[in-house]
């Protein structure tokens, strides 16, 4: 009897073992296949990445680092982590990489733990200007444990106010300055940030979670050699599994980072995720990834130009990377209402505050749109022009209806067009 139970444990499919979870996954697969994904922080991973993340590496505990584990039997997971480290170093041209952080928040926390003490002062981009929660938001640990000095964008053009950065740095003498964000669509001047950091004796940390794939693909300047340390997620524009990574050229910082990640913040790393990170980093080292990164930027610019041509304002006037913030006020819409209407039309995005937004954070005056997932799917400029026109069609219908319920007829018509478009670009056909 026990033998039969064991056989079932190792052989029963998910569909047989847990039909409720299987059903949810099947519905999510259908959603991803038929909807246009425009959330800037999302992407679509390869079959190889999926296979690595769903592998038997999930069974293995491996506290420590390759060659220095606190558990036995780590010789093969060591291979996976060593490959991830070496590929990360090669991809970004750095001397040290830690691939163990489980998330973007944890990678940033690890840098704080390595370089700061509670109560120290650091600077980061204000959340309302396109920063991240972990860059000092008062609701986040980073804003509770440290003295945070935020900088922002100029009100007239929504570009980074580097004069404000320099002035506040001189006044407040931060120990760390963070450059990088989640909703800033222009090129970052890493050199100027480093000059300011050096002037006040601060570390410069770059959070390139959103643009790492563009950096790797040659479409955005690298933060190295300007920054002391850089963090990035491995999903988003890198097209890997969800997780984090920390990079540096400084051996002393690398030692502090390693100690901060383990044992400072985490115990056993997720070896199946690290294996998948290695696969994604290997993919990003291929020549075709540069073509992908270039197409992402072309597609984002096409989408922004299409929306502008149809009467919408793009924050800062356009985009140099993979994303844009769309100011909806000319269409008399809020981000909350637009996100829901576009969702009903099978276009997925997220409501997002715009700089100096008069609306509440859960309502907002804008939406954030991104090109990475659609580009992975195979969309090029023609498809993103069509996507932009479909977005405008939904927003115009929403304006005409002037209701939270939206315009059912318009949304149904757009939904049919979206399905026709996505059917031309199938994904995961083997499933």
From Swiss-Prot:
SUPFAM superfamilies for this protein: PLP-dependent transferases
Pfam families membership: SHMT
InterPro entries to which the protein is assigned, alphabetical: PyrdxlP-dep_Trfase, PyrdxlP-dep_Trfase_major, PyrdxlP-dep_Trfase_small, Ser_HO-MeTrfase, Ser_HO-MeTrfase-like, Ser_HO-MeTrfase_PLP_BS, SHMT-like_dom
Subcellular location: Cytoplasm
Reaction it catalyzes: (6R)-5,10-methylene-5,6,7,8-tetrahydrofolate + glycine + H2O = (6S)-5,6,7,8-tetrahydrofolate + L-serine
Keyword match Transport: no
Enzyme class: transferase
UniProt entry tagged with the keyword DNA damage: no
Cleavable signal peptide: none
Superkingdom of origin organism: Bacteria
Positions carrying N6-(pyridoxal phosphate)lysine: 236
GO cellular component: cytosol
GO molecular function, one term: glycine hydroxymethyltransferase activity
Binding-site residues, (6S)-5,6,7,8-tetrahydrofolate: 127, 131-133, 252
Pathway as given in its UniProt record: One-carbon metabolism; tetrahydrofolate interconversion; Amino-acid biosynthesis; glycine biosynthesis; glycine from L-serine: step 1/1
Listed CDD domains: SHMT (cd00378)
Cofactor: pyridoxal 5'-phosphate
Family: Belongs to the SHMT family.
Role summary: Catalyzes the reversible interconversion of serine and glycine with tetrahydrofolate (THF) serving as the one-carbon carrier. This reaction serves as the major source of one-carbon groups required for the biosynthesis of purines, thymidylate, methionine, and other important biomolecules. Also exhibits THF-independent aldolase activity toward beta-hydroxyamino acids, producing glycine and aldehydes, via a retro-aldol mechanism.
Subunit structure: Homodimer.
Protein's name according to its UniProt entry: Serine hydroxymethyltransferase 1
Species assigned in the record: Rhizobium meliloti (strain 1021) (Ensifer meliloti)
């Amino acid at each position: 009897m026990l033998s039969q139970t064991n056989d079932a444990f190792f052989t029963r499919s998910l569909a047989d073992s847990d039909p409720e979870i299987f059903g949810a996954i099947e519905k999510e697969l259908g959603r991803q296949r038929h909807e246009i994904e425009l959330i800037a922080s999302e992407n679509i991973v390869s079959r190889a990445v999926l296979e690595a993340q769903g592998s038997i590496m999930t069974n293995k505990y491996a506290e420590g680092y390759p060659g220095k584990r606190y558990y036995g039997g780590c010789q093969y997971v060591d291979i996976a982590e060593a490959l991830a480290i070496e590929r990360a170093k090669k991809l970004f041209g750095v001397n040290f990489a830690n691939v163990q952080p489980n998330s973007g928040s944890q990678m940033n926390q690890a840098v704080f733990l390595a370089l700061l003490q509670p109560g120290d002062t650091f600077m980061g981009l204000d959340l309302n200007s396109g920063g991240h929660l972990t860059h000092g938001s008062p609701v986040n640990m980073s804003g509770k444990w440290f003295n945070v000095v935020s900088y922002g964008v100029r009100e007239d053009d929504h570009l980074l106010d580097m004069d404000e950065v320099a002035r506040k740095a001189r006044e407040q003498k931060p120990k760390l300055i963070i450059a990088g964000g989640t909703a800033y669509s222009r090129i970052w001047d890493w050199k100027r940030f480093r000059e300011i950091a050096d002037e006040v004796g601060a570390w410069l940390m770059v959070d390139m979670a959103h643009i790492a794939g563009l950096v790797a693909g040659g479409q955005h300047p690298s933060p190295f050699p300007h920054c002391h340390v850089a963090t990035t997620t491995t999903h988003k524009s890198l097209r890997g599994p969800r997780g984090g990574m920390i990079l540096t050229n400084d051996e002393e910082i690398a030692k502090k980072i390693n100690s901060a990640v383990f044992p400072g913040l985490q115990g056993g790393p997720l070896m199946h995720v690290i294996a998948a990170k290695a696969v994604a980093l290997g993919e990003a080292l291929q020549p075709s990834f540069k073509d992908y990164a270039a197409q992402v930027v072309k597609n984002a610019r096409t989408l922004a130009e299409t929306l502008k041509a149809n009467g919408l304002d793009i924050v800062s006037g356009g985009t140099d990377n993979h994303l844009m913030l769309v100011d909806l006020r000319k269409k008399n819409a809020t981000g909350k209402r637009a996100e829901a209407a576009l969702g009903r039309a099978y276009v997925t995005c997220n409501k997002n505050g715009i700089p100096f937004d008069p609306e509440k954070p859960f309502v907002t005056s804008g939406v954030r749109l991104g090109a990475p997932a659609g580009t992975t799917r195979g969309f090029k400029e023609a498809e993103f022009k069509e996507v932009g026109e479909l977005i405008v069609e939904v927003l115009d219908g929403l304006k005409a209806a002037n209701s939270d319920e939206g315009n059912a007829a318009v949304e149904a018509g757009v939904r049919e067009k979206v399905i026709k478009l996505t059917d031309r670009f199938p994904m995961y056909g083997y499933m």
